[in-house]
């Protein structure tokens, strides 16, 4: 959860920087941020959120088994 929170904070900082670039009419900065950072951040945040949701679903009486299956079936494919 902490890692997801950090990624969301980083994404917000990049969005703020993009807004500043737009306000200052700097298309090169905006293009650079869009192509190299913003799209990837959104994908990463989505993936982390999905993994976190799956881990929450797997927690329960047999949390150890759920975590094992999560690692085996999900993280090995990334």
From Swiss-Prot:
Main location, first listed in the record: cytoplasm
A Pfam family: Ferritin
Cellular compartments per GO CC: autolysosome; autophagosome; cytoplasmic vesicle; ferritin complex
This protein's record includes keyword Iron: yes
Name the record gives this protein: Ferritin light chain
Record's keyword annotation contains Manganese: no
Residue ranges constituting the Ferritin-like diiron domain according to the UniProt record: 1-59
An individual GO BP term: iron ion transport
Protein purpose: Stores iron in a soluble, non-toxic, readily available form. Important for iron homeostasis. Iron is taken up in the ferrous form and deposited as ferric hydroxides after oxidation. Also plays a role in delivery of iron to cells. Mediates iron uptake in capsule cells of the developing kidney. Delivery to lysosomes by the cargo receptor NCOA4 for autophagic degradation and release or iron.
Keyword annotations: Cytoplasm, Cytoplasmic vesicle, Iron, Iron storage, Lysosome, Metal-binding
Any one GO molecular function term: iron ion binding
Similarity section: Belongs to the ferritin family.
Record's subunit section: Oligomer of 24 subunits. There are two types of subunits: L (light) chain and H (heavy) chain. The major chain can be light or heavy, depending on the species and tissue type. The functional molecule forms a roughly spherical shell with a diameter of 12 nm and contains a central cavity into which the insoluble mineral iron core is deposited. Interacts with NCOA4.
Entry-linked SUPFAM superfamilies: Ferritin-like
Species of origin: Sus scrofa (Pig)
Location of the protein in the cell: Cytoplasmic vesicle, Autophagosome; Cytoplasm; Autolysosome
């Amino acid at each position: 959860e902490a890692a997801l929170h950090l990624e969301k904070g980083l994404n917000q900082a990049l969005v703020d920087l993009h807004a500043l670039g737009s306000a200052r009419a700097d298309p090169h900065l905006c293009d650079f941020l869009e192509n190299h950072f913003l799209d990837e951040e959104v994908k990463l945040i989505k993936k982390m959120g999905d993994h976190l949701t799956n881990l929450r679903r797997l927690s329960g009486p047999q949390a150890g088994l759920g975590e094992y299956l999560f690692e085996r079936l999900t993280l090995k494919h990334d």
